[in-house]
């Protein structure tokens, strides 16, 4: 499943919140989502299970929970309005779904920035098979 996320982000001309989320991550962390976050820990990338491995992985867990509350929204592909100015991400006006998706992405990107000091290369391409602990609830 995670492979689908990376393919989606790499496709030329891809639009939607996955690409927008990638831009937010780059803005906040100065790192590309691929390869730094696409397969990180148990929750960064598509899907997730087990327990978050560290603060970075917890940002992705919380992001998954945020998207989980938006089950009726098209979280992966809905294009929303936002701006990157003066060091801040600001979500713009749109439908309720688009505004909420943007907020989920903004909060996660800011969380990843705050967690940069705890980023561990050992979790960069972490195999799903090592995420066997019982999952936390949102």
From Swiss-Prot:
Q: What is its main location?
A: secreted
Superkingdom to which the source organism belongs: Eukaryota
Q: Where is this site: Responsible for the reduced anticoagulant activity (compared with CBc)?
A: 133
Instruction: Give disulfide pairs as residue numbers.
Output: 42-131, 44-60, 59-111, 65-138, 66-104, 73-97, 91-102
Going by the UniProt record, its keywords in alphabetical order are: Blood coagulation cascade inhibiting toxin, Calcium, Disulfide bond, Hemostasis impairing toxin, Hydrolase, Ion channel impairing toxin, Lipid degradation, Lipid metabolism, Metal-binding, Neurotoxin, Pharmaceutical, Presynaptic neurotoxin, Secreted, Signal, Toxin
* Function comment: Heterodimer CA-CB: Crotoxin is a potent presynaptic neurotoxin that possesses phospholipase A2 (PLA2) activity and exerts a lethal action by blocking neuromuscular transmission. It consists of a non-covalent association of a basic and weakly toxic PLA2 subunit (CBa2, CBb, CBc, or CBd), with a small acidic, non-enzymatic and non-toxic subunit (CA1, CA2, CA3 or CA4). The complex acts by binding to a specific 48-kDa protein (R48) receptor located on presynaptic membranes, forming a transient ternary complex CA-CB-R48, followed by dissociation of the CA-CB complex and release of the CA subunit. Monomer CBa2: The basic subunit of crotoxin is a snake venom phospholipase A2 (PLA2) that exhibits weak neurotoxicity (10-fold less than the heterodimer) and strong anticoagulant effects by binding to factor Xa (F10) and inhibiting the prothrombinase activity (IC(50) is 41 nM). In addition, it shows the same effects described for the heterodimer and binds the nucleotide-binding domain (NBD1) of CFTR chloride channels and increases the channel current. PLA2 catalyzes the calcium-dependent hydrolysis of the 2-acyl groups in 3-sn-phosphoglycerides.
What PANTHER family is this protein classified in? PHOSPHOLIPASE A2 FAMILY MEMBER, PHOSPHOLIPASE A2, MEMBRANE ASSOCIATED
- The protein depicted here goes by the name Phospholipase A2 crotoxin basic chain CBa2
What is the species of this protein? Crotalus durissus terrificus
